[in-house]
């Protein structure tokens, strides 16, 4: 019963089938990007520019104060 409903909604017409494929691919890409970004951030914690930038800026300000 549920399979016939899914078939009639998503796969019966060619246009519905292609729309289902494109929408699924779009959301799968978003999910994959979010997953890989979280893995990358966890693997490189403390090494990204956003986290290291304040240390470099503080060193530059300290060097200017010494002059």
UniProtKB/Swiss-Prot annotation:
Pfam families: UCR_UQCRX_QCR9. Residues 1-17 are mitochondrial matrix. Residues 44-67 are mitochondrial intermembrane. The chain crosses the membrane at residues 18-43. Keywords: Electron transport, Membrane, Mitochondrion, Mitochondrion inner membrane, Respiratory chain, Transmembrane, Transmembrane helix, Transport. InterPro entries: QCR9, QCR9_sf. GO terms for biological process: mitochondrial electron transport, ubiquinol to cytochrome c. It is found in: Mitochondrion; Mitochondrion inner membrane. It is a single-pass membrane protein. Its main location: mitochondrion. Gene3D superfamilies: Cytochrome b-c1 complex subunit 9. It comes from the Eukaryota. GO terms for cellular component: mitochondrial inner membrane; mitochondrion; respiratory chain complex III. Component of the ubiquinol-cytochrome c oxidoreductase (cytochrome b-c1 complex, complex III, CIII), a multisubunit enzyme composed of 3 respiratory subunits cytochrome b, cytochrome c1 and Rieske protein, 2 core protein subunits, and additional low-molecular weight protein subunits. The complex exists as an obligatory dimer and forms supercomplexes (SCs) in the inner mitochondrial membrane with cytochrome c oxidase (complex IV, CIV). Belongs to the UQCR10/QCR9 family. Component of the ubiquinol-cytochrome c oxidoreductase, a multisubunit transmembrane complex that is part of the mitochondrial electron transport chain which drives oxidative phosphorylation. This is Cytochrome b-c1 complex subunit 9. It comes from Schizosaccharomyces pombe (strain 972 / ATCC 24843). The lineage of its organism: Eukaryota, Fungi, Dikarya, Ascomycota, Taphrinomycotina. The gene is qcr9.
């Amino acid at each position: 019963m549920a399979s016939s409903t899914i078939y009639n909604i998503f796969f019966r017409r060619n246009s519905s089938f292609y729309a289902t494929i494109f929408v699924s691919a779009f959301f799968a890409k978003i999910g994959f990007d979010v997953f890989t970004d979280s893995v990358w951030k966890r693997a490189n914690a403390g090494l990204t520019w956003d986290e290291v930038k304040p240390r470099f800026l503080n060193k530059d300000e300290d060097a200017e104060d010494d002059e």
